Amino acid sequence: MSFSGRRVSILRPRNASLSAPRGLSDNELRSETHRQFRDAHEGHRPHAGLDASRASTGVVWCTERASEHGYAEDPSGWANLGQGAPEADDGIEGSFPRPESIPITSAAREYGPTAGIKPLRAAVARLYNEHYRQGKESQYTWENVCIVPGGRAGLIRIAAILGNSYLSFPIPDYSAYNEMLSLFKNIAPIPMPLSQNDGYHIHADKIAEEIARGTQVLLTSNPRNPTGHFVGHDELAQIQDICRDRATLILDEFYGGYNYTTDCDGTTISGAENVVDVNQDDVLLIDGLTKRFRLPGWRIAWIVGPKEFVDALGSAGSYLDGGANVPFQEAAIPMLDPSLVRAEMKALQVHFREKRDFVVGRLREIGFRMDDVPQATFYIWLDLTSLDPPLPPQANISDGLNFFNALLSEKVIVVPGIFFDLNPAKRRDLFDSPCHHFVRLSYGPKMDVLKSGLDGIERVIKRARGQTEKPWEDDVAVQDD
């Protein structure tokens, strides 16, 4: 074959799929909503070399579907309870005002270090020592901190520097882990299903069992997205003792400030308190300005861990993301004064607990049992089968995908629970997923948005029960065949 012939065969692929599509179950075939979901995650590649499924996951998929019904043109007219973002305005009593402009020094015009500027790294280390390591001999320094352009960039850097590893992760958990775990071939992902019956608790003996089976890395959010629970201090210390010298523990602590269990006194949650030696314990902590400082647009986050890990993470930044924005790094330094942060966390906890209680109360009024009230984060992990009395079968909105789809008619966005069933190989039948009958609701937005969203949920439930004049067949909700 000539070289030109080979070139044509590459540039003009046949219409056949690059990989044979999996066979759908009868349940999935009968549901158009589920077929749409599969179409977004599997199928042919319209462009050579492009895997389009990686561009449509989790919140992005939900936003794309909402945009088909007008969300992109008028986002302020929607109640977006899907995106995991806290309200970013200055309206929270007791919270410090966010900068409306920042100075740009001459140094900030240059490339910054890929591990972050030293003053910010030192400020993060001081914050952790003041809040979690008082009286301990081993203290964090700037060399134990790597600044990264957002939490997901931090996770990608961590994944890039891991050796060939079995990595265990609980189900359910943060949806973005799914793509990260499937992207890196040095990682063999091992799911660790948790039980709804005991509140998705991560038991220390289960961690010991996973390590005994050969797990070298463990990854989890704590506090936990989407369930709103967390592993408490004593049990987390036990887990860290089990992992010490045996496995690397990665703790995604972005919701550590949203703690409602200590009477909103500003106490935050972190595994840093249980680290014995900051350079020997293989514990990586990820946090940043995004959630608890309510600055998601700044894209300033950090990883705290042993110096050798931090050195490798800084090197990975040179070929992955180039590092975080220097002017925003400089502006972040005064925000990390330990006493200021304590006061900020107290204000945050009081405000978001009030919103949590409002949302839980409204959901109970609508008919959801709400036996499982979140201890942390700003999420409700809503069991659609907990409605009392149950919905009639013909309503067909007792699974997360169809419930999400029905809410589009009310300009309300939630995230179907299926996205938190981390399933990198995409083998599982959607109807077999333990997360299939859940949705995640965020009470991150302002109160008026929460009220609007819950009003929309109530109307959908009433319509499903036949309690409104509007027929169920509307112009948005997709009907099953």
What are these regions (language model features)?
Residues 1-24:
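N-terminal mitochondrial targeting presequence
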Residues 7, 33-37, 123, 127, ...:
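Conserved core segment of the aminotransferase class I/II
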Residues 30-149, 336-340, 464, 471-473, ...:
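N-terminal small-domain helix-loop-helix segment of the aminotransferase-like
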Residues 78-80, 286, 369-375:
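Short beta-strand
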Residues 105-244, 256-278, 284, 372, ...:
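Conserved core of the PLP fold type I
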Residues 126, 279, 406-415, 420-481:
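PLP-dependent enzyme catalytic core of the Aspartate aminotransferase-like
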Residues 349-360, 370-387:
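Conserved glycine-rich beta-strand-loop-beta hairpin in the small C-terminal domain of fold type I
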